């Protein structure tokens, strides 16, 4: 396995062209790591000082030649797949073609929505303003498979907008097949962690042609507005669709709040199930998705576009083309919205069947006790003899829609700590969530001591590294804010609200205060550091329709405002005198030839 340090660019003093260098890197990727490293060192050793032409090749951009992705191991490095590209294409194709396409799903009994709004089908019509808004608000510099970039498009947006928008609307009005160029996508691999030799640990990420991506974003935005306006998605359950509040924050808080209450009260009557769906996006069935879109009566034009587009998509992985017959794009705004609609429909079906089958009492509020954020699902159920029947309904319902619950990654939590696993008669076995389990990227707060010990150890190392830099205080504060504060603030906010103060929180605050006052943050402000965090978290609860019910229990006043929290953000999030934009701030270290520190700093967080 060949590893490359995170965010380190390859600086090669050579006359090799960029394409030649890509081919060289590709060639060493196909051989064992020890031999590849020897060859790379030998090659670099032959370079002479006379070759002054510098090629700055960012490893992460070598997409088709040498796909690499984020590795969540302790060393935090980019990881290159060792398997041949043909093997990965075979894997993607097997996923895509492994499920029957249900032209008209045979539900038994068939599930139907209780309410279907009457939409104006012209909501899908795209305007010039829609097009310009998407183009001008994108800051990415990368080029698509046809060598088009947003930067280039911005320079000609006024002259091409009318033409492009007219073609978009022609596509939506049309009935014929879409061309291959429109339905093509480059596929990158993103390592999900775990065993790097397991081909399933590399997630396929789609990079659409830019003009397709723009239409994709416009339709996603319009569809999102429809979902919110007509309350189509059950936002008590699915939080990924929320606006003006953080659904991620809400779910992390709510699940941990109820779990901590269960543990504190020694309540043995409840059990939490963290449900993992195997290859969730890849198992969305096109026929079923089309049925759901038609059941919602969104728009015949939109449903027709879905059919014409998704039934013709093909991917390019390392310049080899393949086609699949199931699965939504990961990396597509529209696919994300469609997936949320798909999961919402499944959960509504599941809730009905759980009550009709008697697995759950009719009065049990499944909406109140189910939390979804895209495909991350938590269900709080009664811990009794009907657990097996409930899990059977859950598994069966997902299977109807072409999905599968991954029992190896579905965990539970209950008060009785002597129970480490549960096995049912259908051979499904579920393990207890441990202190290394992550829900939405966050450790469970019942393991608070482990959480704070890890934070303190890593934070001290990072603060010391920032302090050693010969940079202005403003830059140091910004690096702290963007790369440390934003990673720990949610933990402290939520823990402070649920548990109150904690000795380790005080130690963390003292550690931060020592360095930030050294970097000219007012000491008087730092003394209220924790108060601001608590107020900020309280304001989030007060603003959330789903969490507002907890305000009396948590002693959060109705009059709470977050002006102080905003002041807090302003102090740490302000632009530095040297640079105005976020990107320029974060690139400061690179521009000052501190690549080695930059890499080491990132790898330690």
Name the predicted role of every residue range.
Residues 477, 493-494, 501-605:
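Acidic catalytic cores of enzymes that act on phosphate-bearing nucleotides/polynucleotides
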Residues 117-341, 345:
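Conserved pre-catalytic core of RNA-dependent polymerases
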């Amino acid at each position: 396995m060949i590893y490359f340090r995170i965010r380190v660019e390859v600086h090669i003093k050579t006359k090799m062209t960029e394409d030649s260098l890509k081919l060289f890197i590709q060639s060493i990727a196909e051989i064992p790591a020890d031999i590849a490293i020897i060859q790379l060192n030998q090659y670099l050793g032959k370079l002479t000082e006379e070759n002054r032409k510098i090629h700055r090749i960012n490893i992460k951009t070598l997409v088709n030649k040498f796909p690499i992705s984020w590795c969540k191991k302790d060393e935090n490095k980019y990881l290159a797949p060792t398997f041949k590209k043909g093997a990965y294409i075979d894997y993607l194709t097997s996923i895509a073609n492994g499920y029957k396409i249900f032209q008209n799903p045979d539900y038994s009994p068939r599930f139907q929505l209780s309410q279907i709004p009457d939409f104006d089908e012209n909501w899908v019509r795209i305007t010039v303003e829609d097009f310009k808004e998407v183009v001008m608000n994108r800051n990415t510099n990368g080029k698509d498979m046809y060598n088009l970039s947003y930067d280039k498009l911005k320079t000609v947006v006024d002259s091409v907008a009318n033409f492009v928008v007219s073609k978009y609307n022609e596509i939506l009005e049309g009935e014929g097949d879409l061309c291959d160029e429109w339905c093509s996508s480059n596929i990158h691999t993103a390592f999900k962690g775990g065993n790097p030799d397991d081909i399933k640990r590399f997630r396929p990420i789609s990079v659409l042609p830019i003009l397709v991506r723009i239409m994709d974003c416009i339709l996603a935005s319009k569809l999102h507005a429809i979902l919110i306006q007509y309350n189509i998605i059950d936002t008590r359950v699915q939080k990924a669709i929320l606006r003006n509040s953080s659904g991620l924050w809400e779910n992390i808080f709510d699940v941990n709040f109820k779990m901590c209450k269960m543990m504190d009260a020694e309540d043995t009557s409840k059990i939490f199930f963290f449900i993992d769906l195997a290859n969730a996006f890849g198992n969305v069935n096109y026929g079923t998705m089309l049925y759901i879109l038609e059941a919602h009566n969104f728009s015949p034009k939109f449903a027709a576009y879905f059919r014409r587009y998704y039934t013709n998509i093909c991917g390019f992985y390392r310049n080899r083309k393949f086609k699949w017959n199931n699965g939504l794009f990961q990396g597509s705004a529209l696919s994300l919205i469609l997936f949320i609609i798909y999961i919402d429909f499944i959960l509504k079906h599941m809730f009905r069947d759980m009550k009709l089958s008697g697995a759950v009492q009719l009065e049990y509020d499944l909406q109140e006790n189910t939390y979804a954020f895209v495909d991350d699902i938590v269900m709080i159920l009664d811990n009794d003899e009907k657990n097996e029947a409930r899990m059977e309904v859950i598994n069966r319902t997902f299977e109807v829609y072409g999905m599968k619950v991954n029992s190896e990654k579905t965990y539970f939590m209950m008060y009785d700590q002597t129970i480490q696993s549960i096995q049912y008669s259908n051979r499904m076995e579920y393990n207890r969530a441990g202190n290394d389990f992550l829900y939405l990227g966050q450790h469970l707060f019942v393991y608070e001591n482990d959480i704070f010990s890890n934070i303190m150890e890593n934070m001290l190392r990072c603060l010391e590294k920032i302090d050693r830099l010969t940079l202005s205080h403003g830059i140091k504060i910004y690096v702290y804010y963007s790369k440390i504060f934003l990673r720990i603030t949610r933990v402290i906010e939520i823990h402070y609200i649920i548990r109150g103060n904690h000795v380790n929180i005080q130690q963390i605050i003292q550690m931060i205060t020592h360095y930030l006052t050294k970097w000219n943050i007012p000491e008087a402000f730092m003394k209220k550091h924790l108060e601001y965090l608590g107020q900020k978290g309280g304001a989030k609860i007060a603003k959330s329709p789903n969490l507002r019910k907890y305000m009396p229990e948590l002693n959060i006043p109705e009059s709470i405002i977050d002006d102080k929290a905003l002041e807090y953000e302003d102090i740490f999030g302000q632009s530095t005198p040297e640079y105005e934009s976020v990107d320029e701030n974060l690139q400061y270290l690179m521009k000052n030839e501190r690549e080695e520190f930059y890499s080491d700093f990132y790898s330690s967080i």
